[in-house]
UniProtKB/Swiss-Prot annotation:
The keyword Acyltransferase does not apply. It comes from Caldicellulosiruptor saccharolyticus (strain ATCC 43494 / DSM 8903 / Tp8T 6331). It is an enzyme of class 6 (ligase). Keywords: ATP-binding, Cytoplasm, Ligase, Nucleotide-binding, RNA-binding, tRNA processing, tRNA-binding. This is tRNA(Met) cytidine acetate ligase. Its main location: cytoplasm. HAMAP family: TmcAL (MF_01539). GO terms for molecular function: ATP binding; ligase activity, forming carbon-nitrogen bonds; tRNA binding. ATP binds at residues 7-20, 101, 159, 184.
Amino acid sequence: MKAAGIIVEYNPFHNGHLYHLQKTKEITGADVVVAVMSGNFIQRGEPAIVNKWARTKMALLNGVDVVFELPFAYACNSAEVFAYGAISILNSLGVNWVVFGSEAGDISLLKKIAMHLAFEEDEFKKYLKIYLKEGHSFPKARELALKRVSKEDIEFLPNNILGVEYIKWILRTNSKIEPLTIKRVGSLYNDPNLGSGSFCSATAIRQNINNLELIRDKMPPFSYQVLMEEIESGRGPVSLNDFFEFFLYRAIVYKDFLKEQFDVKEGLENRFYKHIFSSSSLEDLLSKVKTKRYTLTRLQRILIHCLVDSKVNQKTLLSTKPYIRVLGFNSRGKRYLNSIKEKVKYITKLDSYIMKNPEYNSLLELEIRASQIHALKYKEYHKYLQLEFKQHPIYIPSRE
């Protein structure tokens, strides 16, 4: 079966995502569309608004055929690590295409930029070092260096950045996957405004989550229904500020609670400790700690990894192949899974897999902890703390 891969978060699934899915099917003619989706925490360092099982259901009801999990360690990380994890999974699955949205909408341009990034010529390294010395954050320094060596005036907006990273890893891994891009329509990735049309960003939906009538027309009916069910059942919405007291507890009990954590350098733990007890919320704390070098999303990811007690470093992640776990599938997806089961070892039952495959224990332990921490903010949290072991992949028959 010819398979098209998409890399998603669906936080939550909105009309822009449906457009991306429909265009993917149209331009590839694929027999099946497989999604690699973030779990309960997302790339920008926030909890998903509802859990991964609800978002898997949204995906399947709207026409995705199989949903695979992007493990926490990759999902809540830099664009480079996020992209590596997702492309590694799609490589293992042997998909024919990866189709992603971008602000540029120009695959030739993105490929040209990715070539510089994939092979890091001396000229690129020289300018990167210069811009880092000037005090820019790593993402900004890299953006400036890429513009300098490529002589392209591309805007390094979130989806362009991820698209370049996907292509970079396709090049570095000598992958046979063909990258394709669809020009993003409607609002920018992090635009907080709902606007008057049917398209808006997931950010805008999350910021207006307490006024459900306002967001109804921005989401496909199936997605809106699932979101309503989750909220009415007390399993959402979950937000970053919900976890502020957990960080306060860690700061009170463990003075050096950040020192050994993921991505903490240059005395950053001291800045956190200096401001945490005078802050009224996580947003307040982050506004005090943020610097030119440490972006808001980077700080949020640091806090999330602290919350989950993740000490795994990027170098290890970039030399490790992530596990392949099925979150859900439809009838076409079932046929696809049957067609690859002889060559791809994928997880459907977590408990039995852990016992047989100890090499993935550290990644799976992080995933389990992340899911349990996410569940602590549900109304009846005690019912969901073991959900990782109880929940089998969701099956929804295809509407063919």
